[in-house]
Swiss-Prot record:
Residues 432-450 have a biased composition (Basic and acidic residues). Residues 415-431 have a biased composition (Polar residues). It is found in: Nucleus. Disulfide bonds: none annotated. Residues 414-450 are annotated as: Disordered. This is Transcription factor AP-2-delta. It comes from the Eukaryota. GO terms for cellular component: nucleus. Sequence-specific DNA-binding protein that interacts with inducible viral and cellular enhancer elements to regulate transcription of selected genes. AP-2 factors bind to the consensus sequence 5'-GCCNNNGGC-3' and activate genes involved in a large spectrum of important biological functions. Pfam families: TF_AP-2. Binds DNA as a dimer. Can form homodimers or heterodimers with other AP-2 family members. Keywords: Activator, DNA-binding, Nucleus, Transcription, Transcription regulation.
Length: 450
């Protein structure tokens, strides 16, 4: 047994006192054996002896904290002190030694395969500890990892335990669904050595997921509302044309100033795949709209449009402008000018209505050409979504004013052709001719006299 696995020492030589050094020695040896790319024959059945006092359980205790740094340093020293674990196992000089080592494993005793089985289980335990440190343990259970490492105990065919995939960090048949769920929820993949790495250094996230909720800046205390900020919106604030720094982004998200506030924000963004370097300078000028999240900016634009539609004196303004040009020679030219202005304004409104700039959690498909859409998107990003709806509301109000001007000109020209005076002119003449005086009486009543 010692010839096959020189790194495993008998119990009589090493005292099993539960110390970390002994556990790490088992870890370094068993992991190196399990990671060796060896093909096993299906002709040698795997049997388990009734009693195995020669081999201690390779599992760590439940309260054991796995430290990869100590393991790496100890494993390096362990490789140079034991000839069976060759650090130059993939070089050409050790080819003959690797073939001899393969023959020893291939014709080994059935008990030798127990070590390989324990090594796989030990690697699963180490993988469990690493994923717990990354905070992604909720995405799967240890029972699922046991399915990947414990062959026939969970329904796998007995001969499949001899395949090299389960001991080399490769998922067995039927484990694709488990691996896909772990990748989707944690953004983690298994490398060739059974370790855990991040896919591209970031977690896989959905841009429409909620990043935080921000209280409104413009709302009164009696009607305070919160607006949801998505990951896509935070990415837009960090991207051109604004390229906000940590201080401005923290102000938008209404984060309290603290000593490590910028570092905590950068770490949270880094976990989501967003890069916010320290010492970054903003690229655009800061305005009052910069402090608004997109939800509040859209709310402000909607209230502005409603106020313009209901409260702006469009009829009075339109008639006042049309009354400045009541000469018969000017009326026809004035009508043509108003109609041309209405047509141009309508074309401008139609263009803005086709704007498909990304806002909130929506990213609609562009309708306009990219040459004009990118400019509209730039304006929308600078104003946080307030600009285009506000301009549309102003254009709608302007269209109403032009319509009132046109109605007044048509009515005035019709009255001129029939010879009937205008109603406004009648009212003005009546105000001049009729002068009413009010005199109080003894009874306290008001008496009207002409």
């Amino acid at each position: 047994m010692s010839a096959t696995f020189p790194g495993l020492v008998h119990d009589a030589e090493i005292r099993h006192d539960g110390s970390n050094s002994y556990r790490l020695m088992q870890l370094g040896c068993l992991e190196s054996v399990a990671n060796s790319s060896v093909a096993y024959s299906s002709s040698s059945p795997l049997t388990y002896p009734a009693t195995g006092t020669e081999f201690a359980s390779p599992y760590f205790p439940t309260n054991h904290q796995y430290t990869p740094l100590h393991h790496q340093s100890f494993h390096y020293e362990f490789q140079h002190s034991h000839p069976a674990v060759n650090p130059d196992a993939y070089s050409l000089n050790s080819l003959h030694h690797s073939q001899q080592y393969y023959q020893q494993l291939h014709h080994g005793e059935p008990a030798d395969f127990i070590n390989l089985h324990n090594a796989r289980a030990l690697k699963s335990s180490c993988l469990d500890e690493q994923r717990r440190e990354l905070g992604c343990l909720d995405a799967y259970r240890r029972h699922d990892l046991s399915i990947m490492s414990h062959g026939s105990q969970y329904g796998m065919h007995p001969e499949q335990r001899l395949l090299p995939g389960a001991g080399l960090g490769l998922p067995p048949p039927g484990a694709d669904d488990l691996q896909g769920s772990v990748d989707a929820q944690c953004g983690l993949v298994l490398n060739g050595q059974g370790g855990v790495i991040r896919r591209g250094g970031t977690c896989v996230v959905n841009p429409t997921d909620l990043f935080c909720s921000v209280p409104g800046r413009l709302s009164l205390l009696s009607s305070t509302s919160k607006y949801k900020v998505t990951i896509a919106e935070v990415k837009r604030r960090l991207s051109p044309p604004e390229c906000l720094n940590a201080s401005l982004l923290g102000g938008i998200l209404r984060r309290a100033k603290s000593k490590n506030g910028g570092r905590c924000l950068r770490e949270k963004l880094d976990r989501l795949g967003l890069n916010l370097p320290a010492g970054r300078r903003k690229a655009a000028n800061v305005t009052l709209l910069t402090s608004l999240v997109e939800g509040e900016a859209l709310h402000l634009a909607r209230d502005f449009g409603y106020t313009c539609e209901t409260e702006f004196p469009t009829k009075a303004v339109g008639e006042h402008l049309a009354r400045q040009h009541t000469e018969p020679k000017e009326q026809n030219a004035r009508k043509k000018m108003v109609l041309a202005t209405k047509q141009i304004c309508k074309e401008f409104q139609d263009l803005l209505s086709q704007d498909r700039s990304p806002l909130g959690s929506s990213r609609p498909t562009p309708i306009l050409d990219l040459d004009i859409q990118r400019h509209l998107t730039h304006f929308s990003l600078i104003t946080h979504g307030f600009g285009t709806p506000a301009i549309c509301a102003a254009l709608s109000t302007f269209q109403t004013i032009l319509s009132e001007m046109l109605n007044y000109l048509e009515k005035h020209s019709a009255n001129k052709s029939t010879g009937t005076p205008d109603t406004n002119q009648i009212n003005s003449n009546s105000d001049k001719t009729l002068r009413k005086t009010e005199a109080p009486t003894k009874d306290g009543k008001i008496e009207k006299t002409e």
